[in-house]
A protein has these predicted regions:
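ASCE RecA-like P-loop NTPase motor cores
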Residues: 1-311
């Protein structure tokens, strides 16, 4: 690393960055050279870094290269990858995205690698997302009914027994919940209205692993909704459909769109979600967030800017 850090080219880039003279254009780096250069910038800067590439394959390659050098490297896959893989794989990618969103909310030094598609997408407003992060510690007075409602809003499924991420169960004064950001689920027990104990447990044996003092429970989905926002969105979707039908004469196109919208509305009413819900965020929020809202004070590195711009 020392030869790179002491090189004239790197020192020039470092000088530009320290003076805030952006953007800085760098040419002639090989694929491995890019990762080595990004590593050097990370070592010499106090800021976290976002690397944006033209597609998910390249983002994954850079992520794997950087992970060889550094511990705090995260890969944010695009939603298209999540939607079009088989269920088992897309489930893992769903948790991977949520893990990175959690890291974006932490003020720690890190590198996040993503594609231009993921970077340009819209997200739940940051403050709304943060308001659904539950922090519970021993000695807190809590209302399990209120927590249960918030977990459902946050994408958790209520079941008799917790067996996987994104699930919770409630039996009297015992709440089991498996956040996507945790290796094991939590078992939270009350004495009256006060949290008496918090333990992690094994999903297969249901036996306790260890006692902990606090549990941080992140949402189990990206799009956070309430009954009110769903009703508002359905009203806007139906109005948009009606306006479209008045402008288009092709009956087949109108019928196909009507079936799609009504199917999404039905799923929204029953399950509070549907497969391509991220594309409909403007119906739910007047001002959906972008990654810029989540990534404050980051250094942005655009790999192959021409190809990213072409996307």
């Amino acid at each position: 690393m020392a030869p790179l850090l002491n090189s004239e080219a790197f020192q020039k880039v470092k000088s530009f960055m320290e003076s805030g003279n952006y953007p800085v254009m760098i040419n002639g780096l090989s694929d491995s050279g890019k990762s080595y250069f990004i590593n050097g910038i990370y070592e010499e800067s106090d800021k976290p870094i976002v690397v944006v590439t033209h597609n998910d394959i390249e983002a994954r390659n850079i992520y794997e290269d950087l992970s060889f050098y550094l511990p705090n490297v995260y890969y944010l896959p695009s939603r298209e990858i999540v939607f079009y893989n088989i269920d088992a794989i897309s489930g893992d990618l769903r948790w991977a995205r949520l893990k990175v969103i959690k890291e974006m909310l932490r003020s720690t030094k890190k590198i996040i690698v993503t594609s231009i598609d993921a970077f340009a997408a819209t997200y739940t407003p940051k403050e709304l997302y943060k308001s659904h992060i539950l922090k519970i510690k021993v000695g807190d007075e809590v209302d399990f009914k209120e927590i249960s409602h918030k977990l459902i809003e946050s994408g958790y499924e209520r079941l008799e027994t917790v067996e996987g991420k994104g699930e919770f169960s409630l039996r009297g004064g015992i709440l089991d919940v498996f956040p996507p950001n945790s290796a094991n689920p939590f078992r939270i027990e009350l004495f009256g209205d006060e949290v008496d104990s918090i333990r992690t447990f094994n999903v297969e044996s249901q036996r306790s692993i260890e006692k902990v003092k606090r549990a941080e429970i992140f949402p189990a989905k990206e799009v956070i909704l309430s009954k009110e926002t769903i009703e508002h969105a359905i009203e806007k979707m139906r109005k948009e459909l009606s306006d479209f039908e008045n402008k288009v004469s092709d009956k087949e196109i109108k019928e196909r769109l009507r079936k799609l919208i009504e199917r999404n509305i039905e799923s929204l009413q029953e399950n509070w979600s549907f497969e391509t819900i991220d594309s409909y965020l403007p119906f739910f929020f007047d001002k959906p967030a972008t990654l810029f809202d989540y990534l404050n004070n980051y250094t942005f590195i655009i790999d192959d800017a021409k190809r990213c711009k072409g996307k």
